[in-house]
Amino acid sequence: MSTQNTNAQNLSFVLEGIHRVKFEDRPIPEINNPHDVLVNVRFTGICGSDVHYWEHGSIGQFIVKDPMVLGHESSGVVSKVGSAVTSLKVGDCVAMEPGIPCRRCEPCKAGKYNLCVKMAFAATPPYDGTLAKYYVLPEDFCYKLPESITLQEGAIMEPLSVAVHIVKQAGINPGQSVVVFGAGPVGLLCCAVAKAYGASKVIAVDIQKGRLDFAKKYAATATFEPAKAAALENAQRIITENDLGSGADVAIDASGAEPSVHTGIHVLRAGGTYVQGGMGRSEITFPIMAACTKELNVKGSFRYGSGDYKLAVSLVSAGKVNVKELITGVVKFEDAERAFEEVRAGKGIKTLIAGVDS
């Protein structure tokens, strides 16, 4: 990998190919829309999708054909504002929502801009990501952070917004029981948001004991490590061990693993709600008999939509969700590749990359 240029104007962390990255000085992006702002990126979290592009060069139909800046979980400081910007000023600390919709297509007009057919999402080919010194966004996709939220915490607003959207899809009500499959960052945040919504029982499920130990200390009321058994058997154990009666009210999969999907369907009571938030193989088997005979509400969840980022910031500022505990490492910008290696190795919960030193 090429070394960092300390005199660069807009140093960027660029993926050239599988396991091939470099530091590259790129032009400082221009503000071409009067409603846009230029943000000096200060912290960026590493997402599983970033690591997947680094390891494989593609995710499904999204293939890295040209050099691409990685990163999309970011926070920063407003460096410059367009002439029509009214809600932000230079020096404001912001959480950065990294997907810009067209605002004109049918999903956008229906209020579901996360499903925009022309979405320009950071670090999704062909669009560059936020692991650069500067990045331009519309002002309404930058969320001013209150003084109670640090810039490090601000970078976690992205995965927290994913969790917020999943929980909103689930329609969780106070007193309900929720089983969350996958105790990675998004799964852990789903546990926290579910509790904030009033869930009385939140059971985290994972195959890694270390993650379950963290989940229990963080937000889960109970944990479950699946045995090498049939999904129906594991589901019954979850129900019995947690006194869930005829089954859980809500099951959320944040893993994308086929056994978790099966167990999630079987762990639900009749009329329960299942939300698929994790992505795995494009096609898997599915227990349609259980889904039909229990008349389950089965939903997907993709990224985040209208109001999700704002709610994420509110949950943290109100003290209802703690994201600071998830940050287990911060590395300098010049050590970005090492951070990717650590995430691939499963070290820590959430690693942040600090912004380029001025």
Swiss-Prot record:
InterPro entries: ADH-like_C (IPR013149), ADH-like_N (IPR013154), ADH_Zn_CS (IPR002328), GroES-like_sf (IPR011032), NAD(P)-bd_dom_sf (IPR036291), PKS_ER (IPR020843), SDH-like (IPR045306). NAD(+) binds at residues 182-187. This is Probable D-xylulose reductase A. It comes from Aspergillus niger (strain ATCC MYA-4892 / CBS 513.88 / FGSC A1513). Belongs to the zinc-containing alcohol dehydrogenase family. Xylitol dehydrogenase which catalyzes the conversion of xylitol to D-xylulose. Xylose is a major component of hemicelluloses such as xylan. Most fungi utilize D-xylose via three enzymatic reactions, xylose reductase (XR), xylitol dehydrogenase (XDH), and xylulokinase, to form xylulose 5-phosphate, which enters pentose phosphate pathway. GO terms for molecular function: D-xylulose reductase activity; L-iditol 2-dehydrogenase (NAD+) activity; zinc ion binding. It catalyses: xylitol + NAD(+) = D-xylulose + NADH + H(+). PANTHER family: SORBITOL DEHYDROGENASE. The lineage of its organism: Eukaryota, Fungi, Dikarya, Ascomycota, Pezizomycotina. Binds 1 zinc ion per subunit. Its EC number is 1.1.1.9. The keyword Metal-binding applies. Its cofactor is Zn(2+). Coiled coil: none annotated. It holds the Pfam family ADH_zinc_N. Keywords: Carbohydrate metabolism, Metal-binding, NAD, Oxidoreductase, Xylose metabolism, Zinc. Zn(2+) binds at residues 47, 72-73. The gene is xdhA. Pathway: Carbohydrate degradation; L-arabinose degradation via L-arabinitol; D-xylulose 5-phosphate from L-arabinose (fungal route): step 4/5. GO terms for biological process: D-xylose metabolic process; L-arabinose catabolic process to xylulose 5-phosphate; sorbitol catabolic process. It comes from the Eukaryota.
